[in-house]
């Protein structure tokens, strides 16, 4: 489990096509400290497994389904990525519960800067819209954010300077893809309510 609090901006140093998968080598001095084979690291919100680890770099294999459902397929050598290690039992939950299972992708639609923050509008797949509410949580490229406005096919978030400086969202431009993970609690509530309604018939 992750919290959506990005630990560092990493960098893609190599991409190898394996046919039905891709192998990424990524640099991240913070997240690789003490890393072991089989550990999980979230890369732009996607939970990946460490295959190899050497120095401040690690490699991870990404299956075709993950490449299809996320924006990882758009990464190339030199791309910056948000990195986070799983949260430890008993540690603070600084953001919200993030599984690292991307629900879909959106696109940055617009950026509106102001004196102290920036409003970013992101497109939202129709099948995810019901899980996104104003003041609720959403994960964008692995970053736990609070929804400012929820529309039928978009939402907006407000980014403070720290988020702009320390994550990829400070660099994303209109048209760039982002990974989206909706709040898992909303999905559980929907499933529970569906079961209750079915039992009452």
Predicted ranges, named:
Residues 1-201:
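Conserved loop->alpha-helix
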